Amino acid sequence: MQQNEPPPQAMQPASPTQLPAALVREFDGEHLEARLADAVHLSTVGEDGWPHGAQLSAGEILAVNATTLLIAIWPQSSTTANLARDGRLTLSLVHDGALLEIRARSHAVAQRQTALGLSVFRVEIESVIEHRAKYAEVLSGVTFRLYEPAQVLSRWREQIAMLRTFA
C-alpha cells in the first residue's frame, strides 16, 4: 500500500445479519455444476482455543434463507467435534469483489446421513461483514480441481437432496 492510499476497510453490506440475495441463490443447491471448483472457508474454534480451518464445497452447503444455512460435514472431523462442543463458526468467501466474513452459531440436527455418514448442522447467521478495499477487488478465493467431477457431482446432488429434508 502506498502512503497516499486509504487503508482497506471493513464495510457492512446492505443487511449486516443476512446473506446477500445473490449468495442465497448461489447456495440454493441448484446449479452445482457451475460451482465445481469453488470452496467456502470454514473456521471453527479448536479445543485448544486456536482457529481450525476447513473447506466446504457447493455440495455441502444449502441456504434455507438469508439467515439460515445447512451444512453437511464429515462425522469424525475436528470441525464436527468443534461445532458440537462450541457451535461458533466463521465462513469466508469472495463475493462481488470483496471478502465476506460470515459469523454464525450452529447446532447439530442429524448424524449418519447419506452413505458417507455425514453430520448435518443448522447454521444461524449472526453477522455478515464485507471487507472491501477502495484500491482493489478480490477476484477469487479457495478453488480446487475435482479428479472425478461426474462422480462427485452425483454425490453432491444426493447430499443437497438430503439437506433439503432438514430445511
Regions found by a protein language model. Name each.
Residues 1-167:
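Binding-site signature for planar aromatic cofactors or substrates
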